[in-house]
Amino acid sequence: MVKNSFISIILKEQEENKENRGSVEFQVVSFTNKIRRLTSHLELHKKDYLSQRGLRKILGKRQRLLAYLSKKNRVRYKELIGQLDIRERKTR
């Protein structure tokens, strides 16, 4: 059971392939869900520094996965960015 209805829509597409839970897309969706929950938590608890550190770590993991996906398959990267409504990473 998924608590977040937004993520459940994307997870339904991913659940067609049960073996695909380790895919980059599934991991990015999971990290995005955690990021949104932590962000709403930190709006209430501004001085929760351990949660801030956890949020920064998850953001870094998601950023690395998105960089990997953009190098390997640009089309899937663009689709995922569009579905999750995430900004595209800056290029140097």
UniProtKB/Swiss-Prot annotation:
Specify the protein name.
Small ribosomal subunit protein uS15c
The organism's lineage?
A: Eukaryota, Viridiplantae, Streptophyta, Embryophyta, Tracheophyta
Concerning Pfam families, the annotation shows: Ribosomal_S15
Listed disulfide bonds for this chain? none
What species is this protein from?
Helianthus annuus
Q: How does it assemble?
A: Part of the 30S ribosomal subunit.
Keywords associated with the record: Chloroplast, Plastid, Ribonucleoprotein, Ribosomal protein
Q: Name one GO molecular function term.
A: structural constituent of ribosome
Q: Which NCBIfam families match?
A: S15_bact
GO process terms (BP): translation
Localization terms from the record: Plastid, Chloroplast
